Amino acid sequence: MSDPSESFGLDILADLRRYLVGPTVRTILDIGANEGQSLLQFRETFPEAVIHSFEPSPEAFEILKKAAAKVPDVQIYDYGFADRSGVQDLHISLHSCLNSILSSGKEYAWPSAPLDGRVSARFQTLDWFLSEAGIELVDILKIDVQGAEMLVLKGARNALSSRIVRSIKLEICFLSLYEGQGTLDQIYKCLTGHGYLFTGLYDRFYEDHGRLCWCDALFIHAGEFADKKSPQFP
């Protein structure tokens, strides 16, 4: 008899495919799409899904646009998400994947790529977008916004409380990389308070002294487990 603990927790997309065994995955929100790094992975794993990709940085969005043109069923948007709608400063780095609505923290780890630039960018709330787009079910919500994950979740209160989001994949920072960043404790309390189960950490990155810098976390709504039998251990 195979041990499931030996196969879960290794590949976050493979695990998502195993958790979401009910309705076919048809809607993926890629928040913090940057230059489109996740597009091909999502498309290969979930071929029937429409991917909605969001990127507020003008320069990164132009690269995202080119990447999306090569992938079917992708819709792109030149704005990001926060706890309120409006124009806000986006802190810009030489490496666009480090851009954040937050300023750099005391343990910001890229001295050669400081967040020393700013650009005005548009932000919306996730609740507004879902209402505007008429989306009633989100299979995968991916959030990678460099420390601002809690701002996105605060703007998604209605979506989280109404159980229209089946799973959430998001990045969590453990060092003080960004000023006012969401913590594991805050994110855990927020999502478990809305009925989500924490299922694992993936793609962990450590600094030279062994401290965990950041990783991806996966939360699945408890409703996805409603018809599954309780585990039986020897």
Predicted regions located by residue number:
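Phosphate/nucleotide-binding beta-alpha loop and adjacent structural elements of enzyme active sites
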Residues: 1-234
